[in-house]
Design a protein with these regions (language model features):
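N-terminal leader/targeting and pre-domain segments
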Residues: 1-30, 35-37
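C-terminal cap of thioredoxin/glutaredoxin-like
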Residues: 13-16, 54-65, 119-194, 200-205, ...
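A near-ubiquitous, low-amplitude feature marking generic local secondary-structure context
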Residues: 26, 30, 34, 44-47, ...
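Short hydrophobic/aromatic-rich motifs at helix boundaries and adjacent loops
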Residues: 31-35, 69-73, 130-132, 193-195, ...
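A short, charged/proline- and glycine-enriched loop
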Residues: 36-43, 197-204
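Structural alpha/beta surface segment adjacent to cysteine/selenocysteine redox centers
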Residues: 44, 49-50, 55-123, 216-318, ...
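The substrate-binding groove and active-site-proximal loops of carbohydrate-active enzymes
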Residues: 48-49, 209-211
Length: 410
């Protein structure tokens, strides 16, 4: 398929998939079907017995049942297949340390055994896996309600907001009180004035891919965090998973797009008009970012400001504006919005050195125990994965600045 036609089709299909109007219509249809049949509002929960996130999610089931007029069906499921979780060993290690920190933040004690009455024998796991697949997912710790999936504690606020909007809360919130949820999304503290560094300024290492929707959500916040706390910023580009030989099956891609859309709405960011940059567009983008980082080095910029501007412009173009970075005009638009001209674009595309840099960054990321993006770390503190963990990054910055203990939850 010609690249230009592919970009057009990508914009159209992604726009339809992430359309708020179509999402709201689907929700109304589910609600109408429930009312016409007189059935209960059913929340299906997929519990993976050996999953730390499932241990946390299961701990809030009694709270959800007490707060909402819903029937909860709990199904045991096996771990995701390799196509959905291609680096299982690192996923397990990351999940264990991340879930401990997440539990401390929310003040939730994880269950040490499956929910009462849940069968976890081989046949039950197989039935749960079949139901999960039929409903369109692949992970544990997943809540499914009337056509939409919500992952663990991190998306519980979206689920509860929807339940409350449907009038399913047993005790509705007072007018103007806002939505009260069991695990509110963490917020950044933005301490003012920020603490002064103890000697050397901390450095944020940011592992970035240009095909990651979640990276688009993270990059602006991360840039502002570094500036606010006076941290240096090292931008480390890596190729997307699918361009590193790691599969990304359709159910996973679909969930990521839909989840990114609702998170983008919460953060006030545009998202949904997508020109998928997989392949040559991403390679051209990384070349341009590396050229910008070389300019930063010459100019003595310790915050990677030009490289960050190019990466942010690329991500906005790919995921919010539908700009085809595979075309000369598209890449030039991206460059110009970041302050670079056509000569810089030509120089960047003539230099293939970015490939060795991206590979070195990939190996560094793996050595830190992670494989996906967005990932980041402060100095030599453990690396973090996911735009939902920016609050932990801020905690680590405060630790480096001498204002908090490691893993602080305040």
């Amino acid at each position: 398929m010609p690249a230009r036609l592919s970009a057009i089709l990508s914009r159209q299909s992604s726009g339809a998939l992430t359309s708020p109007a179509l999402r709201d219509a689907r929700r109304r249809l589910h609600g109408l079907r429930r009312r016409l049949t007189g059935g209960a509002a059913v929340l299906r929960y997929s519990h993976q017995p050996d999953d730390p996130y499932s241990a946390l999610a299961a701990a809030v089931l009694p709270r959800l049942e007490a707060r909402y007029r819903i029937r909860i069906e709990t199904h045991a499921v096996p771990p995701p297949v390799r196509a959905a979780a291609p680096d299982m060993a690192r996923l397990i290690d990351w999940s264990q340390r991340d879930a401990r920190r997440l539990a401390a933040h929310h003040g939730i004690t994880p269950l040490t055994a499956p929910p009462p009455g849940l069968a976890t024998d081989a046949q039950s796991l197989q039935r749960g896996a079949q139901l999960r697949a039929r409903l369109g997912h692949y992970l544990g710790a997943m809540f499914h309600f009337e056509g939409e999936w919500y992952w663990g504690l991190d998306r519980l606020h979206h689920l509860e907001t929807r339940l409350q909007s449907l009038g399913l809360a047993r005790q509705p919130s007072s007018p103007g009180a806002g939505v009260d949820t069991s695990a509110p999304p963490p917020v950044l503290r933005w301490l003012t004035p920020p603490p002064a560094p103890r000697g050397v300024r901390p450095t944020i290492h940011f592992y970035c891919s240009l095909r990651s929707p979640y990276t688009w959500l993270a990059i602006g916040q991360l840039r502002r965090l570094a500036a606010h706390y006076g941290a240096d910023l090292s931008l480390q580009m890596v190729l997307p998973m699918v361009m590193r030989g790691l599969p990304v099956p359709w159910p996973k891609r679909r969930y990521i797009l839909l989840d990114t859309k609702r998170e983008a709405e919460r953060l006030g960011l545009p998202f949904g008009r997508i020109a998928d940059p997989v392949g040559a567009p991403t390679e051209r983008g990384i070349a341009l970012v590396q050229h910008a980082l070389a300019l930063d080095a010459v100019r003595g910029h310790q915050d990677s400001r030009t490289g960050m501007a190019v990466a942010e412009s690329f991500l906005r173009g790919a995921f919010a504006k539908g700009i085809d970075a595979g075309s000369r005009d598209g890449l030039l638009r991206i460059a110009e919005r970041a302050g670079l001209d056509a000569a810089a674009v030509d120089a960047a595309l003539a230099d293939d050195a970015w490939r060795a840099v991206a590979e070195a960054n990939r190996l560094d990321l793996l050595a830190r125990g992670l494989w996906g993006v967005p990932s980041f770390r402060v100095d030599e503190l453990p690396a973090l994965w996911g735009q939902d963990r920016l609050f932990m990054l801020e905690q680590d910055l405060l630790t480096a600045l001498g204002s908090a203990s490691p893993g602080a939850t305040t």
